[in-house]
Design a protein with these regions (language model features):
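Glycine-enriched, solvent-exposed interface loops adjoining structured elements
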Residues: 1-132, 137-213
Length: 213
């Protein structure tokens, strides 16, 4: 769901004011008010990304489909392969090859100990169509998603959905999963307080954000 930046700023200010023990910031002098608004706006996308990166899947919205992937599979050995990730890829929602018996929701990183098993010459030791594994790696071409493994190289991509890094669009809107909105406002409030050297209050609001997920 797309939320307008001006409304997000307003809601973050309310969160900050509700957690202050002195004069609410909404009653501050105009120059300070404008500075606060700018500081909040500069932390909105950071707050959205932090929340979306840790939120459980049932709180996330549909996500974005990988675009142009139909002919973009690069095959390796033992029916494993890889695809290039979209430039704005932040988090995988779901990935499934057509001959897999179940999809992958969580990915490994290249420094994960389990990743070494994907280099085994024994296919059963790697991920299989019954127990597939995906790994996010860095290649000369860009970040990629390696998958292990398919039954044959005739397999195609059946599902590929991800959460992108957030951005403010040309109309002043930000795409935020609706069920994560309250957590985002508290996360942004916490980041702003930390930037203003209000460490204890900022840490408290960051914990409030996590508790809502």
């Amino acid at each position: 769901m797309v939320f307008q930046v001006k409304n997000i700023v307003r809601d973050v200010r309310l969160v900050i004011d509700q957690n202050r023990t002195d004069t609410p910031l909404l009653a501050s002098a105009e120059p300070n008010t404008l500075m606060l608004d700018e500081l909040i706006e500069s932390n909105i996308t950071k707050a959205v990304d932090r929340v979306h990166s840790i939120a459980p899947y049932h709180l996330l919205e549909q996500g974005h489909n990988f675009e142009g992937m139909s002919d973009a599979i690069y095959w390796g050995d033992l029916e494993s392969g890889w695809v290039l990730l979209p430039p704005d890829f932040m988090r995988l929602v779901i990935f499934r090859m057509s001959d897999w018996e179940r999809p992958v929701y969580n990915v490994l990183s290249a420094d994960d100990k389990l990743y070494k098993r994907m280099r085994s010459r024994v296919k059963a030791v790697r991920g299989t169509a019954q127990r597939p594994v995906c790994v996010v790696t860095q290649r000369p071409e860009g970040r990629s998603l390696e998958f292990y493994s398919c039954k044959s190289e005739e397999a195609t991509i059946a599902q590929a959905v991800y959460i992108p890094y957030s951005k403010i669009d040309n109309y002043g809107g930000v795409d935020i999963s609706e069920k994560c909105y309250d957590a985002v406002t508290r996360m942004a409030a916490g980041l702003v307080c930390l930037a203003l050297n209000e460490g204890e209050r900022g840490a408290s609001m960051l914990e409030m954000a996590k508790a809502l997920l």
